[in-house]
Each structure stands twice: as structure tokens, then as C-alpha cells.
């Protein structure tokens, strides 16, 4: 009997340790065996003998192809050279890179070494990069020569080793930096060094930064066990939830420094032996050309890219018929956009997933992507992944809710984070004593087990899928001598989804202008954190506790102020 025929609605009333009765939601797909005792790299390359000579990484702009054997060998060589450079087990390597094959090779090398990879947006300001590097105790940074000026103080003051991936001899490598090609050189003790590394499933392999439900960016500790579990939940089993296979060509235009691309494109693609087509940034004509030339079959996207494609007349010039899956994440996709995408990609299944960095990151995924698919509804962001539990709770009482009742989404399973780095208080606020991770998102599960996102409790602003923490911008703004109080909230915007706007209380007799405020922030942050609008106000609404009442400010925006 096929897995789909065996599958039944696996919602059940379950006795919890401390709750009289929790309504637990599970996947329609049966649980599977997950070998999460393996290190991440051993799991990823477990079946390499089946596709050693197949394309693994395709550099979109250059066309250069790395086979699976190439990637395996080079990653191990880099790991051995990490060891030579003094990177020890559990040390942190920062990847300050756009999408490129070197990102993948370096991430895997960190895993082989028993080190931890943290990734940062190369467009971050020097202060933003330094904050993450110091908080994570980064020992080595892999980047491009053009970004070295931003991180020179880390080299000079903290002894951080800098490696540049530029392989063109015409590009001079800044003084004191190493070339990436030096790390890829074979070393006689490579196998001995790497094979002697003993990795615990609970060791941290990835350290993405996330603001969580509130506050400033924090290091999210994702373990070997957690990432193996998350990837397996998606692509393993006789009827995988996300059906990737070794003949697929998977587009990777979403930033690899974001957990969505790192996990659901890079790691999932590697696990099944697919070819991963890497684009350093979104350029619609190049993207369409590469889809046609490389016969891309899977196109993971975020709503702003979906919107750009939906509105573009350029699509008519290209053959996009090879695409069988369009997967959207990072923010809900509306019905109009769904219809537009279906028109542009006539042979593609369109569906959504729902994730959060702290959850590993995937909580739910469309069962329309399964090898033996289930019917799905427009607007749903999937069904809870297998080998995990989900519940919906009343945000005020914490009581478990049943179907069709909106509440806070909670997830439990081996895939969730170990915790926030050096922040037990924030960890305890996010993961309760029974192991449930509280997302800060409001959703409901309907009669067909499909999850719908209704609202957001958390303060986070999502600009084209990027996280913007209001608290981070407020901390900057309150440092301005002419600002006495401030609150930052999200405002809806078609192209970006959401943009940050500031409500500002000026000091008495100040002549502070909107442009003054915008420029003050823009000099200190990456482009997507810039303030879009400034509203001057007499006071900021606050609860008796002093907490900003953001919902009141969002209501003002919704009512046109």
C-alpha cells in the first residue's frame, strides 16, 4: 500500500507532562527513520557513490561545474587547511559571501573540521559584521577582497584570519590575507586530520543570527542532529514531503547566508544528489536565461521575486517549461500572486512552506510537493513536517487549541535549535520546559491539517524575506541627540512585503526633519534596515510595563494615520 493510502489524519489528544490535554498535530505522512546520529557531512554524502560524477554545483555566471566528488574532496582539503590555520573543533568560521560555490565548500569544510559556520550578509556595515563576529568569537572569515576593508579591524585587533575567494590574479589580495586557493591545496595529512575528528550529534554546526520573536539578533545554535533531522523531514522517505531527486536542477538565487537557502536548497539538494545552480544575486533576465539554458526544474523563491517575475513581460521570451516546482517561503503568498505564477510556469506545482530560523528552520511544507502529492488549498503554508509535533496555543492562557482556532504556533522535535548562543534567558523565553518552541506567529490548522498564518505576535519586520528587528533600529535612533523617544514598526509595501517606519518624538525646539532621521540610520545599517518613512508624534503608546504598544501604531498605519 502506498504511503499516501496508509496516511491518516494524525491529530490526536495527547497527555502532556504538565498539561491535562494538548491537541497535537502531526504530518499526514508517516514518521521515518532518521539517522541523526551521523554528522551533517556524513549524512549529506551518505549516498555519494550513486552520483559521484554528477554535477553538484553550477556557477551560474561562469558556467563552471563541480561534481559531487569534487565537492567532497575539496571540502575535506579545506577542512584540513582550517586545522593548519588554527581552527579547532567548535571554533567559528564566518562566511561573509554572496552566493557562490566557495560558500558551499566552506560550510561543508567547517562541518568536516568539527567547527561551526556562521554566515553574514556581505552588505552589512562594518559595525554589524563586527557585532556578529565578536558575539560568535569568530576565528576565521572567508570573504571577497572588496569586503576586506569592513573587517580589517577584526584582523588587526582580534587576530581574525581573513581568506579571500577571488581567484583572478588581476585582483590583488589585500595585505595580510590568504587566497582561498591556498585552502583547496591537497595536504598529506588531510584524511588523517579529518577522520580523527569525533563529532557529537549535539555539537553546533551552524550559527545563523536571528532576532527571534523580539529584541536584537542572537546566535541560533543548530546542531548536526538538528540539521540532519530537518533535511530528512523534507527529502527522505519513500514518499518525501519535498520530492527532490538526482536529475533535478535546483535554482539557488536566494541568499545562502539565510537559513531558508542554506537548508532547503543547499543541504536538501546535496542530500539527494541534485545539481544546484548558484546565482550571486537576483537579476531577472539572467535568471530567466539560466532557467532556459540549464533546464532548471525546481525554483525556490520568496514573494518579492515571485512578484517581479509575475509582473515581467520578459518571461515570454524564454522557455520556462522545465520547471516542475515553484516553492515560496519567508512570507505568505497571496492568491493573486499564486495565479500569476501558475500562468508563467504552466508545468509547475506551486506551494508554500513555513519556517523560522530557530525551528531548524522548516515547520510546515505543502504536501503538493510530495512524491505522491496530496491536494492543497490556496493560501495554506503546508502541513507540519513529519517526525515532529505542532500545537496551537492561546497566547494569553497557554491553553492548547483545537482545529480552526487561531493561536500561537508551537513546534517540538529534534530539528529545533539547541538554544541561543550565550543567552539562556532568551532561550527559556522561546523554548518552554516541555520542549515546545514558541514561534510568535499566529496561525490555525483546518480540518484537512493545513496550516494558515493569520497574524504575527512577534515584532519582526520582513523586508523581502530579510529580518529587521525594530529594537535594533530603536537602539540606534534613541542615540540621536534630538530624539527623546522612538518606536519602529512594519508598514505594508507591495514590492518588499514590509518596510520599517519610525514614530519619533523630537526633543523640545528641535528642527529634526524626516531626511535627517533617515540619513542618520542609513549610514549605520545594511540597505534593507533603512527607515522608509518617519512620523513625528507627541508620544509613543506604551503599556504600564513600559513596553511599546506596536499594535496601536500598526492600527494607525492601517487607518491612514
Swiss-Prot record:
CDD domains in the record: 4CL
Keywords: ATP-binding, Ligase, Magnesium, Nucleotide-binding, Phenylpropanoid metabolism
Pathway annotation from the record: Phytoalexin biosynthesis; 3,4',5-trihydroxystilbene biosynthesis; 3,4',5-trihydroxystilbene from trans-4-coumarate: step 1/2
Catalysed reaction equations from the record: (E)-4-coumarate + ATP + CoA = (E)-4-coumaroyl-CoA + AMP + diphosphate; (E)-caffeate + ATP + CoA = (E)-caffeoyl-CoA + AMP + diphosphate; (E)-ferulate + ATP + CoA = (E)-feruloyl-CoA + AMP + diphosphate; (E)-4-coumarate + ATP + H(+) = (E)-4-coumaroyl-AMP + diphosphate
Residues where CoA binds: 281, 464-465
Signal peptide: none
EC main group: ligase
Pfam families: AMP-binding, AMP-binding_C
Keyword Repeat applies: no
Any one Gene Ontology molecular-function term assigned to this protein's record: trans-feruloyl-CoA synthase activity
Cofactor annotation: Mg(2+)
Listed InterPro entries: AMP-bd_C, AMP-bd_C_sf, AMP-binding_CS, AMP-dep_synth/lig_dom, ANL_N_sf
Induction of expression: By wounding, UV irradiation, and pathogen attack.
BP-aspect Gene Ontology terms: phenylpropanoid metabolic process
Region (SBD1): 283-352
SBD2 as annotated region, ranges: 353-420
Annotated binding of ATP, by residue: 210-214, 218, 352-353, 357, 441, 456, 547
GO CC aspect terms: cytoplasm
Domain remark from Swiss-Prot or TrEMBL: Both substrate-binding domains (SBD1 and SBD2) are involved in the substrate recognition, and are sufficient to confer the substrate specificity.
UniProt xrefs under PANTHER family: 4-COUMARATE--COA LIGASE 1, LONG-CHAIN-FATTY-ACID--COA LIGASE
UniProt record similarity statement: Belongs to the ATP-dependent AMP-binding enzyme family.
Name this polypeptide is given: 4-coumarate--CoA ligase 1
Amino acid at each position: 500500500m502506498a504511503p499516501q493510502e496508509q496516511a491518516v489524519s494524525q491529530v490526536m489528544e495527547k497527555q502532556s507532562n504538565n498539561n491535562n490535554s494538548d491537541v497535537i498535530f502531526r504530518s499526514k505522512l508517516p514518521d521515518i527513520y532518521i539517522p541523526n546520529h551521523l554528522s551533517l557531512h556524513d549524512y549529506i554524502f551518505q549516498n555519494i557513490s550513486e552520483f559521484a560524477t554528477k554535477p553538484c554545483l553550477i556557477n551560474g555566471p561562469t558556467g563552471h561545474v563541480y561534481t559531487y566528488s569534487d565537492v567532497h574532496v575539496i571540502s575535506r582539503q579545506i577542512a584540513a587547511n582550517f586545522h593548519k590555520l588554527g581552527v579547532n573543533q567548535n571554533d567559528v568560521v564566518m562566511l561573509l559571501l554572496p552566493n557562490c560555490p566557495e560558500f558551499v565548500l566552506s560550510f561543508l569544510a567547517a562541518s568536516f573540521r568539527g567547527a561551526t559556520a556562521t554566515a553574514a550578509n556581505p552588505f552589512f556595515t562594518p559595525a554589524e559584521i563586527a557585532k556578529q563576529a565578536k558575539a560568535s568569537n569568530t576565528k576565521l572569515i572567508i570573504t571577497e577582497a572588496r569586503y576586506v576593508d569592513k573587517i580589517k579591524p577584526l584582523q588587526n585587533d582580534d587576530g581574525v584570519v581573513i581568506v579571500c575567494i577571488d581567484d583572478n590574479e588581476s585582483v590583488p589580495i589585500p595585505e595580510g590575507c590568504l587566497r582561498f586557493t591556498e585552502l583547496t591545496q591537497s595536504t598529506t595529512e588531510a584524511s588523517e586530520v579529518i577522520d580523527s575528528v569525533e563529532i557529537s550529534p549535539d555539537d553546533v554546526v551552524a550559527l545563523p543570527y536571528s532576532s527571534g520573536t523580539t529584541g536584537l539578533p542572537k546566535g541560533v545554535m543548530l546542531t548536526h542532529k538538528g540539521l540532519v533531522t530537518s533535511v530528512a523531514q523534507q527529502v527522505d522517505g519513500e514518499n518525501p514531503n519535498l520530492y527532490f531527486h538526482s536529475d533535478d536542477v535546483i535554482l539557488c538565487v536566494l541568499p545562502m547566508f539565510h537559513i531558508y537557502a542554506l537548508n532547503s536548497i543547499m543541504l536538501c539538494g546535496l542530500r539527494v544528489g541534485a545539481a544546484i545552480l548558484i546565482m550571486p544575486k537576483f537579476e531577472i533576465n539572467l535568471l530567466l536565461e539560466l532557467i532556459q539554458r540549464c533546464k532548471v526544474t525546481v525554483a525556490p523563491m520568496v514573494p518579492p521575486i515571485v512578484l517581479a517575475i509575475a509582473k515581467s513581460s520578459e518571461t515570454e521570451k524564454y522557455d520556462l517549461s522545465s520547471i516542475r516546482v515553484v516553492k515560496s517561503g519567508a512570507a505568505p503568498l497571496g492568491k493573486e500572486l499564486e495565479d500569476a505564477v501558475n500562468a508563467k510556469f504552466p508545468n509547475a506545482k506551486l506551494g508554500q512552506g513555513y519556517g523560522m530560523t530557530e525551528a531548524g528552520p522548516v515547520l510546515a511544507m505543502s504536501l503538493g510537493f510530495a512524491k505522491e502529492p496530496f491536494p492543497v488549498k490556496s493560501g495554506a503554508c503546508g502541513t507540519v513536517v513529519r517526525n515532529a509535533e505542532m500545537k496551537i496555543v492561546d497566547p494569553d492562557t497557554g491553553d492548547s487549541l483545537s482545529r480552526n482556532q487561531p493561536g500561537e504556533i508551537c513546534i517540538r522535535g529534534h530539528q529545533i535549535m539547541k538554544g541561543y548562543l550565550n543567552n539562556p534567558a532568551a532561550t527559556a523565553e522561546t523554548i518552554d520546559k516541555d520542549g515546545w518552541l514558541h514561534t510568535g506567529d499566529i496561525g490555525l490548522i483546518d480540518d484537512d491539517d493545513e496550516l494558515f498564518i493569520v497574524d504575527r505576535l512577534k515584532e519582526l519586520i520582513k523586508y523581502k524575506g530579510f529580518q529587521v528587528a525594530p529594537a535594533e533600529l530603536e537602539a540606534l535612533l534613541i542615540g540621536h541627540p534630538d530624539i527623546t523617544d522612538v518606536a519602529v514598526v512594519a508598514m505594508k509595501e507591495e514590492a518588499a512585503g514590509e518596510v520599517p517606519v519610525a514614530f519619533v518624538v523630537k526633543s523640545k525646539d528641535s528642527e529634526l526633519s524626516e531626511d535627517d532621521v533617515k540619513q542618520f540610520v542609513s549610514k549605520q545599517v545594511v540597505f534593507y534596515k533603512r527607515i522608509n518613512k518617519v512620523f513625528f508624534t507627541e508620544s509613543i503608546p506604551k503599556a504600564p510595563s513600559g513596553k511599546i504598544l506596536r499594535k496601536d501604531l500598526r492600527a494607525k498605519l492601517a487607518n491612514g494615520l
